[in-house]
Amino acid sequence: MPIHPSTTPPPDLYVAVNGINTRYWQMGDRGSKLVLLHGGNGSIEFWLYNIAVLARHHQVYAFDMVGSGKSDYPDGSYSLGYQAEFLHSLMSALAIDSATLIGNSMGGGVALVFTRLYPDRVDKLVLVDSMGLGREISMGIRLITLPAIVNLLRPGRWMIPAMLKSNFYHSQQLPPEWIEFRYPIFAIPGRNKVILRLGQSNFNLAGVRAEVYQPIVDSLAQITQKTLIIWGEYDRIIPVKHAYTAAEGLPNYQLEIFPNCGHHPYLECPAKFNRLVLGFLTA
């Protein structure tokens, strides 16, 4: 499993967005602007092996999405629509007129909703094992809609490998340093309440809510931006068939399936991912 730290984390920066204190990283001072959107219950640390490489040629922003990481945890819905509107406010606060959106999992779903709402703010799209392209999602995600299950979660280091195991193809090789990156996020007080709210806003026991994914699928043909679809062949969170759903609906796409990868190709195969994205951005 070729995960290895390639950089130290950039300094944490904060910006108030609609009264919500939001953590972000920014690297790079030339080229076009990129916004990196992590998945549900993730954080900007997920992009640690990509941001410095991308920033050699681009101005790159990554932020803890509302209710995630070290950003504030407001009350209310965490639907894709709400998160897309929050992204719009964040980009305005940081003077990002338009950008390429690179979204993994729920971040991909947010990118798709945002592109439908604000097409003039999106230059290109990179969808990485994206949510929002069908009902199917892992049972573990469906179970976080149940209070009794979420209340069992405890912020111990031992839980991190157990929770992330199904995300990776080479699950037995999760690096120890990755546990150290993630543990402070898991240990933040009040996380369980947010996990439940995030789950119930977007999922039920059958999978992704129809009112969440169906409008996205129905509007794919209207997305004219060049779109790079990247998927891990052995994704156990969101099945690879959703990559082909995206390809069938999008009029201007490039599809890349990563063999021997799971839900996070940018972590399991960072060098390949970085080369592919940089090539797509310059094409």
Identify the function of each model-found stretch.
Residues 253-283:
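Catalytic active-site module of serine/aspartate enzymes centered on a nucleophile-bearing elbow/loop
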Residues 20-70:
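Conserved HGGG/HGGXW glycine-rich cap/lid loop of the alpha/beta-hydrolase fold
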Residues 223, 229-231:
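Short beta-strand/loop motif that positions the catalytic acidic residue
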Residues 17-18, 25, 48, 61-106, ...:
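Active-site loop/oxyanion-hole signature of alpha/beta-hydrolase fold enzymes
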Residues 22, 156-219:
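Conserved alpha/beta-hydrolase catalytic His-Asp/Glu region
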Residues 116, 124-156:
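Flexible "cap/lid" loop of the alpha/beta hydrolase fold
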Residues 234-238:
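Acidic catalytic loop of the alpha/beta-hydrolase fold
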Residues 1-34, 56-58, 96-97, 278-283:
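Alpha/beta-hydrolase fold catalytic core
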